Amino acid sequence: EAARLLGSAPIDVLCFGGTSASFLHGTSYDVALTKKLTGWAPGPKITTASTATLAALAAVKAGTVALATPYVDGVHARAIRFLEENGHKVVSSRNLGIDTDQALAEVPLEKIYDMVREIDTPEASAVFISCTNFKSVGAIEALETAIGKPVVSAIQASFWHSLKIAGVKGAKPGYGSLFAGMEAHAPGGSS
């Protein structure tokens, strides 16, 4: 119902923001979900958090990944399966075992930072932080500086992909290497 209502609104992009809800049943489910949303809301371009994640990992040329999630074991295992069925070997991972949405949103940024530092390995070409309710964006630039590789989060990827498919430039620095080249510049070349 929400997709139908939004489909008639003057919007350019509709992003289904549930990361685990879009990957839980695999890639074919994510594709079917996108088609269903397109049918319900034929006006805007459609993406999902999982589709956006795959596009973001491709953009940063991630092959092998280290995975950080707040999920319980079963959902974490499905996140690994989703990434691997889409060509991203998971070489290291950790999950927090959280099972409520409110608790997901209450994880301190420092804990997410420490978690990523723990799972990073030389074999990983990038780190992926799953869950759009896992507030990780504020740590991305510091993590990339510390570990020297791209860090992609589900919420960051969703925002980036929504801007990309809408053809929008204008991201401000601070969202990680995924946004390189998307900054808007004032006439004359200054920011």
Please name every model-derived segment.
Residues 1-190:
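Non-catalytic structural scaffold of enzyme domains
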